[in-house]
Amino acid sequence: MQVASATPAATVRKAAAGDELSEFFALTPDLLEVANASGNASLQLQDLWWELGLELPDGAAPGHPPGGGGAESTDTEARVRILISAVYWVVCALGLAGNLLVLYLMKSKQGWRKSSINLFVTNLALTDFQFVLTLPFWAVENALDFKWPFGKAMCKIVSMVTSMNMYASVFFLTAMSVARYHSVASALKSHRTRGRGRGDCCGQSLRESCCFSAKVLCGLIWASAALASLPNAIFSTTIRVLGEELCLMHFPDKLLGWDRQFWLGLYHLQKVLLGFLLPLSIISLCYLLLVRFISDRRVVGTTDAVGAAAAPGGGLSTASARRRSKVTKSVTIVVLSFFLCWLPNQALTTWSILIKFNAVPFSQEYFQCQVYAFPVSVCLAHSNSCLNPILYCLVRREFRKALKNLLWRIASPSLTNMRPFTATTKPEPEDHGLQALAPLNAAAEPDLIYYPPGVVVYSGGRYDLLPSSSAY
């Protein structure tokens, strides 16, 4: 029996980065019987599976899962593919609009660009913008039953760009979580130094040092993301399978003494470790430390928004307690949003790793998850790129005000000179009187105030902004 005689088409499942072959599944009841009965058939199917760098499950042959519904299963799978393609286009449109808006607002506001934390926000918007530009390619591929019509060169380019920006996005989210906590600690250290008579130059040098360090860190993040994407640049290629051209990861056999299965499993393992587990650990640690910092600090006795007196003895006022509650909710959103967006896809990828390393057997349940659950997990992971602009920027008052001014200018161009597009921003109304998380004697140093979740605010009008209700 020749493998080419199998009538059902090949099915290729893409992982969250949209760039690698996750599994080549094809199991028909007819060929299942032949594969179990014919040594030659099993050998040829095994050769095809290993040619793709995959492991052929026992008794598997191109088509549908064992006991599958044949044409009914094919129709359901086609509907899923079309739905996933439509979602890709929607995510692409929303991601382009949202991230372009963030980039425009950052470019328009001279004061905002001086902030080290906003440098991370700008780079995050840039990487998400580049990432969603690759989604139309994967949408077309899904709609065409995973056939790749764009050629080998575009396969390599799109695969690497997708992977690099996936890593860069996660790395920048992690860097922002570190920066949020570090800004609080640095501001407190600067305040104590000035308290010893070292002057305002310390605060200025701290700001300049943080800005320079942020630029260096951004460069390192982009370099790390490019390095992590080298396997895509080297091993992404097009291969003809059953007469169809597919874009997939194809590792050489016996590379450095290891077979294709090992390298494909190692490739997936890198994505799980660098793209999920390590960033999640750092993000969770930073925000847990931040919440602990807020809970342990003795806050300046203040008056809340309605004039209620602060708690005596240096304790938290009602307004300060409300502020702490707000930050705690923000941190919860941060961790949960990252966890929920990436967990389903990374869990299925981990399952794939265990199969490739022969830790668990291939099963029909795994096949069904790859066919139906995996595409949904991919969409959920991709949606992160259009959620970031909302969660990081547009929930903040100054960004909403800038957006309102921009829309007003577009709607009334003849009145532009009457209402210029300025960068004036103020803290949220509920933050008045409780925007400082400082030592008890901080009132004597009004030029620098700081409040969670790590935003440094200078009373002279400069703000080191990061939305308190942002995500990641």
Curated annotation (Swiss-Prot):
Q: Which domain of life is it from?
A: Eukaryota
Q: Topology in the membrane? A: Multi-pass membrane protein
Protein's UniProt name: Relaxin-3 receptor 1
> What family is it from?
Belongs to the G-protein coupled receptor 1 family.
Q: Which cysteines are joined by disulfide bonds?
A: C155-C247
Show the coiled coil region(s). Answer: none
Q: Which residues are glycosylated?
A: N36, N40
Enumerate the PANTHER family for this protein: CELL ADHESION MOLECULE, RELAXIN FAMILY PEPTIDE_INSL5 RECEPTOR 4
Q: Where are the transmembrane segments?
A: 82-102, 120-140, 157-177, 216-236, 271-291, 299-319, 333-353
Q: Name one GO biological process term.
A: phospholipase C-activating G protein-coupled receptor signaling pathway
Q: Which UniProt keywords apply?
A: Cell membrane, Disulfide bond, G-protein coupled receptor, Glycoprotein, Membrane, Receptor, Transducer, Transmembrane, Transmembrane helix
Write out the GO MF terms: G protein-coupled peptide receptor activity
Q: Does the keyword Transmembrane apply?
A: yes
